[in-house]
Swiss-Prot record:
Domain Glutamine amidotransferase type-1 positions: 25-225
Active site: C104 (nucleophile), H199 (for gatase activity), E201 (for gatase activity)
Region (Disordered): 228-251
Pfam families linked: GATase, IGPS, PRAI
Catalytic activity field: N-(5-phospho-beta-D-ribosyl)anthranilate = 1-(2-carboxyphenylamino)-1-deoxy-D-ribulose 5-phosphate; 1-(2-carboxyphenylamino)-1-deoxy-D-ribulose 5-phosphate + H(+) = (1S,2R)-1-C-(indol-3-yl)glycerol 3-phosphate + CO2 + H2O; chorismate + L-glutamine = anthranilate + pyruvate + L-glutamate + H(+)
Residues holding L-glutamine: G76, P77, G78, Q108, S154, L155
Region (Indole-3-glycerol phosphate synthase) residue spans: 255-519
Protein name (Swiss-Prot/TrEMBL): Multifunctional tryptophan biosynthesis protein
Organism from which the protein derives: Aspergillus niger
Biased composition (Polar residues): 232-242
Function as written in the Swiss-Prot or TrEMBL entry: Trifunctional enzyme bearing the Gln amidotransferase (GATase) domain of anthranilate synthase, indole-glycerolphosphate synthase, and phosphoribosylanthranilate isomerase activities.
Pathway: Amino-acid biosynthesis; L-tryptophan biosynthesis; L-tryptophan from chorismate: step 1/5; Amino-acid biosynthesis; L-tryptophan biosynthesis; L-tryptophan from chorismate: step 3/5; Amino-acid biosynthesis; L-tryptophan biosynthesis; L-tryptophan from chorismate: step 4/5
Region of interest: N-(5'-phosphoribosyl)anthranilate isomerase: 535-770
Amino acid sequence: MADSGLVDHSPHHPTKAAQLSTASNVILIDNYDSFTWNVYQYLVLEGATVNVFRNDQITLEELIAKKPTQLVISPGPGHPETDAGISSAAIQYFSGKIPIFGVCMGQQCIITCFGGKVDVTGEILHGKTSPLKHDGKGAYEGLPGSLAVTRYHSLAGTHATIPDCLEVSSSVQLADDSNKDVIMGVRHKKLAVEGVQFHPESILTEYGRIMFRNFLKLTAGTWEGNGKHFGEQSSTTKATVPSNPPPKTDKKLSILERIYDHRRAAVAVQKTIPSQRPADLQAAYDLNLAPPQIPFPARLRQSPYPLSLMAEIKRASPSKGMIAENACAPAQARQYAKAGASVISVLTEPEWFKGSIDDLRAVRQSLEGMTNRPAILRKEFVFDEYQILEARLAGADTVLLIVKMLSVELLTRLYHYSRSLGMEPLVEVNTPEEMKIAVDLGAEVIGVNNRDLTSFEVDLGTTSRLMDQVPSSTIVCALSGISGPKDVEAYKKEGVKAILVGEALMRAADTATFIAELLGGSSQTVSSESRRSPLVKICGTRSEEAARAAIEAGADLIGIIMVQGRTGCVPDDVALPISQVVRSTPKPASQALHTSQEPPAATSVEYFDHSAKILRHPSRALLVGVFQNQPLDYILSQQQKLGLDVVQLHGSEPLEWAKLIPVPVIRKFGLDEPAIARRAYHSLPLLDSGVGGTGELLDQSRVQNVLDKDCGLRVILAGGLDPTNVAGIVQKLGESGRKVVGVDVSSGVESDGAQDLNKIRAFVQAVRGL
């Protein structure tokens, strides 16, 4: 090899330092790079005891359990956010606890973990030796102000995104005569966390072994704990700092940039956690575990108001601070849905907006079983397919894509990925240039943010100014700053189809009234159907005569007991004629349903309200078969054989059976049992004591407590009811009595152990008077 002026700085005949008791358990994370073992060699030569683990072969929990004295992150190929395995999560956890040193990709992981960005430098280097200028602190303590280092990289941290908590400790100049430099070292200002982009373990790097020696002297997780005071440059070190300091290092980032950087770091860490890795999410999606979804654009076109409402769950914001810290996201969602919202926007950003993906998951669960439920939007700073897949698995129907924060290439990629999961995104714009990008993209729904995300200033005229750029088929939504009816008047005239409201809704004393006033409706627009007398169920029916008398009196449900050994159990040869009577006997004309006051189709109806309606047949009574702890196959067989319209489960059957039985299910609950108000399983819960049929009255105060726990709960009340007490018991419940949508009687209409037709008629008449 010709003499090139290169100097071999490797320890040809190394002298191993004495064993360091303070570096007795150094953990070295191997990012699948051959240089890892050069790093290992230098650490061992300096007296450290080192254990090496590949980045995908140890979990964070296992790493924590090993109680390392220092942590070193090795070089490696690829990008720190996708190829560093456990590295970023380890940095996040151990920062401030133990000293951390990163080499090459290890430094890049440090930068991204604290909110910075890594990007191409314009150079692709492999074994390039460059002159380094440094600040003489940390790893560089005691070294000459300029020294030769060896570089193997094409990526590096970017000056404009280095967060305030980090300082640039060294740099090299680009070789293109641009007088610009590349970040070669960063250091946390308070925590004992330092990184280098070059390779101190290379044989062509000067003083590499001393750099590792300086690191191994550290024993505490902070500089102060190690007797160092970094973060401010002293007069003695200023001369060694690069002569052309990066002009953007101290640039104040916009709120959007700060949030974006923080989310990038957080998502990078999350993607390394077992059970939350991209492959884990994809596996769950491939198992069809994502909740059912609805088409976002179609739901936006349905509203009981002149404009559709996108109602937002928002605990805080960067501009207003804390808004509703203690808000319960699922409870808020139900209020919005019943008030006529077409979409519920759930902010899932945790630091500035105090939301989470768990909020979205809970919101989706809270709307389960509602008719025409609102679509669910994940309001988040999305920059990765991972976040879109995570949203779909949590139950989102759409996601937000912000044009301002995405390159056209990335925006296009994310848009099409979201659509591949069945979610048409909401594409957010703020300027004419951004609107053109969204229109060219083919977005079906475009949201115009009246708030400039750089300055966070609000201009309600922003939406109006951009309307002429939008095709007529595109749904335009006005976002941000809307607080009252005057704010939306112009939008109605200009073709805006929807508005998003967050803070004003979260602060509203009466959500439904505020929404109606805001959108020009009335409190009656989304009110449920008018009050009806409760459903009447006559149980323990044992003859055709009793069934016919009950129906002609106006009963809605005729129950027959299918439980062998129970009083009143009827065999099949008795049950079949009763079934025929139920199907052939019409209800009295006075019991015909009136539908004129039912809620508009565009609204969402609570699950139990819908279920109660299903159990109220317009022209005849329904036959209910009562079962108790019997095999599912037997229940299904009897349902088909007898033509049961409804199945009642009166024992300890699994809740999930309600979804396996092809007709509505009434399920008996005691007052202390859980899941009484669980939606989308049993059609209605029946409150009763013991096994039923005992004639024992339920404790009124306890019934009231059960009803008051959930405003959407509807029940059938049983237990000791008879013609003389049923009206008084329901009336005594006061306003909570409106949640009693059915009453059930068995022994209360019997005399001497047999059904009494006069008592049946009297019971029905007493209920109809409510």
